[in-house]
């Protein structure tokens, strides 16, 4: 396969900027990863959150039809912020999540919880279908079948359990808000861009709005599949490539997805390394798992078939090269696309303003 970028050993040149800050400082002081508390969900009302009611929001169906088409009338999603809650309340939740992340940096072979939390936010949002405004992050439905048992969600109970204590501590926050906020914290605390986030998701505790399985990305597919799947959510090719840059964080596990390994050396730092690594030389890995690719130079990194599709299709490749050359541009595009992903289908009040959370490092410097 042709090489379009420097070899992996050279990816730390000026196109990639690492921001270690609190991550490195905290890691040096970590003696071991803390135990993960185990919680159990039920199919009724896990927490009687003030924000977890199932209001019909009378009169909103016509607005939804105007926004999303006639078929969206049954899938009205009006943001409703718990009474008396403001940006400062959500910043406290962010701080608690970020602190817990920083206390568990050795988790998963030093990958930490960044990839887990980003994947949870991504997958709870990635079921959205713009044709009828169904799915997405609004209802926090991943605790219900069949979504909970979607093969593409295997392993995400770890991320949900990581965040569970904050549903207890902050009973007014919805699952949808907490899970997406966790993804924002993962990106920002690992050195990534600021993500605009808005509260107001309302939990579905009746399991009446659970999306069908099959909407999340199947990593074994080709470029056309990737293009069509992201188009279903309302994304163009550029946004698609930007969103898949999330693979820079974390790693795959054979016992969950059938794939194994990190995508590159930056698995606990949000950078553009996914793209520079992807543009190297690869071969199909010889092993007993699903088809995946292994880098020629080190044999330590992996790519999924859907990742490789980004360099095989010209309508994706130009953006891969663009982001490999310009991390600042990638950050800008990712921030915009990810904010769109986690908010898809939700109608916010006209006076609703996005929240930009301060990182722990920024607060330390104040």
From Swiss-Prot:
It is found in: Mitochondrion matrix; Mitochondrion intermembrane space. Its EC number is 1.11.1.5. It catalyses: 2 Fe(II)-[cytochrome c] + H2O2 + 2 H(+) = 2 Fe(III)-[cytochrome c] + 2 H2O. The record marks 119 as: Transition state stabilizer. The active site is at residues 123, 263. The keyword Mitochondrion applies. Its cofactor is heme b. GO terms for cellular component: mitochondrial intermembrane space; mitochondrial matrix. Residues 195-218 are annotated as: Disordered. GO terms for biological process: cellular response to oxidative stress; cellular response to reactive oxygen species; hydrogen peroxide catabolic process; response to reactive oxygen species. Transmembrane segments: none annotated. Residues 195-206 have a biased composition (Basic and acidic residues). Keywords: Heme, Iron, Metal-binding, Mitochondrion, Oxidoreductase, Peroxidase, Transit peptide. Binds 1 heme b (iron(II)-protoporphyrin IX) group per subunit. Heme b binds at residue 247. Disulfide bonds: none annotated. One of its GO terms (molecular function) is metal ion binding. It is an enzyme of class 1 (oxidoreductase). Destroys radicals which are normally produced within the cells and which are toxic to biological systems. Forms a one-to-one complex with cytochrome c. Belongs to the peroxidase family. Cytochrome c peroxidase subfamily. This is Cytochrome c peroxidase, mitochondrial. The gene is CCP1.
